[in-house]
From Swiss-Prot:
It is an enzyme of class 3 (hydrolase). Belongs to the PPP phosphatase family. PP-2A subfamily. This is Serine/threonine-protein phosphatase PP2A-2 catalytic subunit. Its EC number is 3.1.3.16. The lineage of its organism: Eukaryota, Fungi, Dikarya, Ascomycota, Pezizomycotina. Its cofactor is Mn(2+). Disulfide bonds: none annotated.
Length: 328
């Protein structure tokens, strides 16, 4: 979401884990999912098992992961677990509904641990029914500043769960392609990328770089001005309608669907409908007053937007933020 690269410090070294635990059975996974749906966190040892299995599943996926219709496309969640439950109520439960999430599962909301653990568990349990992409907040650097690291310390008493998940984030696909026509990603386009094959050739299994094509895919934004521009975020670029039109034409696409920006109605068309922004965290940061939306795409590639408001809040935890919130 609205994050600036200058807010983060030096990139820590990725932590690599050897598989030392027994794989989870389907019945075990179902038990985990049942608890997670009730907003109950898993024990640390089970989070490790979950992340080890998820790494195997995600490693087999492409940088441009193919997705079939029907599918429901979702934007930022940002740890707003109870609003994720409302999303599933509106859109239908997984696996009955196929889902594509475009990143930013953690930070800012109070339930990043439960949110990302549930989505990863669903990915393992129903790998063909849910696609989870990487957002700019699925990063060691960003999560140390915007909440996920502190939440893991608070809920587990150490940083191990944060390490397990941030190691896993390196394996998340960067983009998805729905029926070879709708291109989905978290941020936006890159001056270093002309074709989808350019994306397929990237080495994604790393911390998000400060610059370059992988960074741009997770950080860039559409803009009213033509051409490429310097992003006020300090990472990625802004891109104009001429850029998105050419990219869609050259790659046989009908649409770029992306997240990354707060839009007050939950979705927003731009650049002569070459780009749509989807944001799925209602009343973002518990104070912005925005609606959220998801995009349902049927078997004929027809899309419908479902908007929803935040679910009622009750008993939010008392959390002291280390850093002030900001908005672009």
């Amino acid at each position: 979401m609205d994050t600036k690269m200058e807010d983060v410090g030096k990139t820590p070294e990725p932590i690599r884990f050897q598989t030392t635990t027994e794989p989870a059975s389907i019945s075990t996974l179902d038990g985990w999912i049942e608890n997670l749906m009730a907003c109950k966190q898993l024990p640390e040892v089970d989070v490790l098992r979950l992340c080890e299995k998820a790494r195997e599943v995600l490693h087999s996926e492409s940088n441009v992961q193919p997705v079939k219709c029907p599918v429901t496309v979702c934007g930022d969640i940002h740890g707003q677990f109870h609003d994720l439950m409302e999303l599933f109520r509106i859109g239908g439960p997984n696996p009955d509904t196929n889902y594509l999430f475009m990143g930013d599962y953690v930070d800012r909301g109070y339930y990043s641990v439960e949110t990302v653990t549930l989505l990863v568990a669903l990915k393992i349990r129903y790998p063909q029914r849910i696609t989870i992409l990487r957002g700019n907040h699925e990063s060691r650097q960003i999560t140390q500043v915007y909440g996920f690291y502190d939440e893991c310390l608070r809920k587990y008493g150490n940083a191990n769960v944060w390490k397990y998940f941030t190691n896993l984030f390196d394996f998340l696909p960067l983009t998805a392609l729905i029926e070879n026509q709708i291109f989905c990603l978290h941020g936006g386009l890159s001056p270093s990328i002309d074709t989808l094959d350019n994306i397929k050739s990237l080495d994604r299994i790393q911390e998000v770089p400060h610059e370059g094509p992988m960074c741009d895919l997770l950080w860039s934004d559409p803009d009213d001005r033509c051409g490429w521009g310097i992003s006020p975020r300090g990472a990625g670029y802004t891109f104009g309608q001429d850029i998105s039109e050419a990219f869609n034409h050259n790659n046989g696409l009908t649409l770029v669907a992306r997240a990354h920006q707060l839009v007050m109605e939950g979705y927003n068309w731009s650049q002569d409908r070459n780009v749509v922004t989807i944001f799925s965290a209602p009343n973002y940061c518990y104070r912005c007053g925005n609606q959220a939306a998801i995009m349902e795409i049927d078997e004929h590639l027809k899309y419908t937007f479902l908007q929803f408001d935040p679910c009622p809040r009750a008993g939010e935890p008392m959390v002291t933020r280390r850093t002030p919130d900001y908005f672009l």
